[in-house]
Amino acid sequence: MDQAVELPVQRLQRASLYLCTDARRERGDLAEFADAALAGGVDLIQLRDKGSAGEKQFGPLEARQELEALEILADAARRHGALLAVNDRADIALAAGADVLHLGQDDLPLDVARGIIGRRPVIGRSTHDAAQMAVAIEERVDYFCVGPCWPTPTKPGRPAPGLDLVRATAAHSPGKPWFAIGGIDQERLPEVLAAGARRVVVVRAITAADDPKAAAEDLKAAISAAG
């Protein structure tokens, strides 16, 4: 089926490399960065500016600024056949025409979020322990994330359940896509894959790389080699 007419939920099935990036306001290179990362094989790209260097320097993104940044990411995602994700905000996801809305444990109830964004976009959920993971398997989210695998500066103060949660999730063999998240980089990726994950979310492994395209290519190759 042509990718242009595939639904996001169908494209999600093939996705294995999920990138969260801030708006890179202090660098002013969001378009170039996104193009490089997506050219390297990133399947989903999410804007998450909370706690970023740009937020510290310029303050929180206002809704209009967030939509402008998402427009840049959406353009790159279209050109590379990737999925665009919005974090937390169903209204922003709707306004941006996003493919994906990602919800945390304390965000909108699933049915409310679905009522806002409609049926086409996929919805994901963060999980941080075995109980939350079990709920995510049963509830009507399209995918979920498990972690953090390691403590991460993007989630300060959050305990890391570690690879045990990845192993437990793999043992459940969920009938929907799931991603390991939290502190994953090229060096740690083999441990994550050995624990049973075949999809990962990364941040600094690509956002802090001197060559984002090469970093994405290396991560994608390792995931693909794991089968």
From Swiss-Prot:
Cited SUPFAM superfamilies: Thiamin phosphate synthase
Signal peptide range: none
MF GO annotations: magnesium ion binding; thiamine-phosphate diphosphorylase activity
Cofactor note: Binds 1 Mg(2+) ion per subunit.
Entry keyword Transferase: yes
Protein residues bound to 4-amino-2-methyl-5-(diphosphooxymethyl)pyrimidine: Q46, L47, R48, D49, K50, N87, S126, K155
GO biological process, one term: thiamine biosynthetic process
Disulphide-bridged cysteine pairs: none
Pfam families recorded: TMP-TENI (PF02581)
Record's keyword terms, sorted: Magnesium, Metal-binding, Thiamine biosynthesis, Transferase
Domain of life: Bacteria
Catalysed reactions, as listed in the record: 2-[(2R,5Z)-2-carboxy-4-methylthiazol-5(2H)-ylidene]ethyl phosphate + 4-amino-2-methyl-5-(diphosphooxymethyl)pyrimidine + 2 H(+) = thiamine phosphate + CO2 + diphosphate; 2-(2-carboxy-4-methylthiazol-5-yl)ethyl phosphate + 4-amino-2-methyl-5-(diphosphooxymethyl)pyrimidine + 2 H(+) = thiamine phosphate + CO2 + diphosphate; 4-methyl-5-(2-phosphooxyethyl)-thiazole + 4-amino-2-methyl-5-(diphosphooxymethyl)pyrimidine + H(+) = thiamine phosphate + diphosphate
Recorded coiled-coil stretches: none
Gene Ontology CC, one term: cytoplasm
Enzyme Commission identifier(s): 2.5.1.3
Listed cofactors: Mg(2+)
Record: residues binding Mg(2+): D88, D107
Classification via PANTHER family: THIAMINE-PHOSPHATE PYROPHOSPHORYLASE, THIAMINE-PHOSPHATE SYNTHASE
Function: Condenses 4-methyl-5-(beta-hydroxyethyl)thiazole monophosphate (THZ-P) and 2-methyl-4-amino-5-hydroxymethyl pyrimidine pyrophosphate (HMP-PP) to form thiamine monophosphate (TMP).
Record-stated family: Belongs to the thiamine-phosphate synthase family.
Record-linked HAMAP family: TMP_synthase (MF_00097)
UniProt-recorded name of the protein: Thiamine-phosphate synthase
The organism's taxonomic lineage, starting at the top: Bacteria, Bacillati, Actinomycetota, Actinomycetes, Mycobacteriales
